[in-house]
C-alpha cells in the first residue's frame, strides 16, 4: 500500500500545482492497468475536489509567511492551532480522495484503503496534539533544517527498504514478522540519521511519531517491541 499512497501524494501535488496534464496521463495509465478506463473522469474529479479542498484549508505561501513571522515572537503555537482546528475537515478531504481513487488502484490495494485512512488520521492527530504544540516545537527547534541536512541519509534508509521489496511478489513471500522487521530497520535508520543533527528534537519527534503509528499497526502484535 505504501507505493499506492505515494502515488496518491503525487496526484495531490499535481492538483495543488494547478498542472493537471501530468496527472491525466498517470490516472489514465493506472486505470487502464486495472481495467477501469471508464473510471478516469471519476478519479480525476475526485483528485480535483481533493486539491480544491486542501486549497480551501491552507495556502502554503501564506502558511510559510505566518511561520516566519511567528518564529521571532515565539507564536508558532498560535499559527498551528489555527490550522489544527481544521483537522476534521482535512480528514474528510483525505477520506474522500482515498475512496475516489479506489476504482483505479486494483483489488489488492483497494482492500487496504481503510488502513491508509487510519494511518493518515493518526498522523494528523499526532501533529495536532495539544493544538499543534508538537509541530510548533519541531519547527522552533530546527526540525525542517535537520531533515534538509540529512536528505541523502534519509533517502538511503528508504532505498534500503525498497530493495527489500523489489516486487509485489517478493513482498508477498515475506511473513508479516519479516516485513515488520524490515520496516523497523528503516525507521531505526531514520532516527539514527536525525540524531546527528545539532538538536535532539527532530530525532525525538520522529521516534515518537513512529512509535505512535506502530502501536495501531499489525506489527505491534506480530513483532512486539519492549522499548
UniProtKB/Swiss-Prot annotation:
Keyword Glycoprotein in record: yes
A GO CC annotation given for this chain: extracellular region
Domain of life: Eukaryota
Known tissue expression: Expressed in the subesophageal body, fat bodies, hemocytes, midgut and Malpighian tubules. Not expressed in silk glands.
Annotated keywords: Glycoprotein, Secreted, Signal
Cellular location(s): Secreted
Principal subcellular localization: secreted
Family note: Belongs to the UPF0408 family.
Protein name: 27 kDa glycoprotein
Organism in which the protein naturally occurs: Bombyx mori
Amino acid at each position: 500500500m505504501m507505493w499506492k499512497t505515494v502515488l496518491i501524494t503525487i496526484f495531490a501535488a499535481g492538483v495543488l500545482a494547478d498542472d493537471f496534464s501530468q496527472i491525466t496521463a498517470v490516472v489514465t495509465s493506472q486505470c487502464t492497468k486495472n481495467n477501469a478506463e471508464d473510471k478516469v473522469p471519476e478519479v480525476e474529479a475526485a483528485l480535483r475536489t481533493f486539491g480544491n479542498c486542501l486549497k480551501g484549508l491552507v495556502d502554503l505561501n501564506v502558511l510559510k509567511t505566518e511561520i516566519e513571522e511567528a518564529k521571532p515572537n515565539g507564536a508558532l503555537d498560535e499559527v498551528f492551532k489555527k490550522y489544527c482546528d481544521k483537522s476534521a475537515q482535512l480528514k474528510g478531504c483525505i477520506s474522500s480522495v482515498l475512496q475516489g481513487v479506489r476504482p483505479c488502484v486494483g483489488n489488492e490495494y483497494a482492500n487496504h484503503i481503510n488502513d491508509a485512512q487510519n494511518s493518515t488520521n493518526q498522523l494528523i492527530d499526532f501533529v495536532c496534539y495539544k493544538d499543534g504544540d508538537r509541530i510548533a516545537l519541531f519547527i522552533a527547534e530546527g526540525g525542517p533544517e535537520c531533515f534538509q541536512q540529512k536528505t541523502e541519509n534519509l533517502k538511503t534508509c528508504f532505498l534500503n527498504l525498497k530493495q527489500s521489496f523489489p516486487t509485489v511478489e517478493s513482498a508477498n513471500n515475506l511473513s508479516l514478522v519479516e516485513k515488520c522487521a524490515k520496516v523497523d530497520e528503516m525507521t531505526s535508520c531514520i532516527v539514527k540519521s536525525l540524531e546527528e543533527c545539532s538538536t535532539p528534537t527532530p530525532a525525538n519527534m520522529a521516534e515518537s511519531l513512529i512509535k505512535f503509528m506502530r502501536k495501531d499497526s499489525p506489527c505491534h502484535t506480530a513483532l512486539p517491541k519492549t522499548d
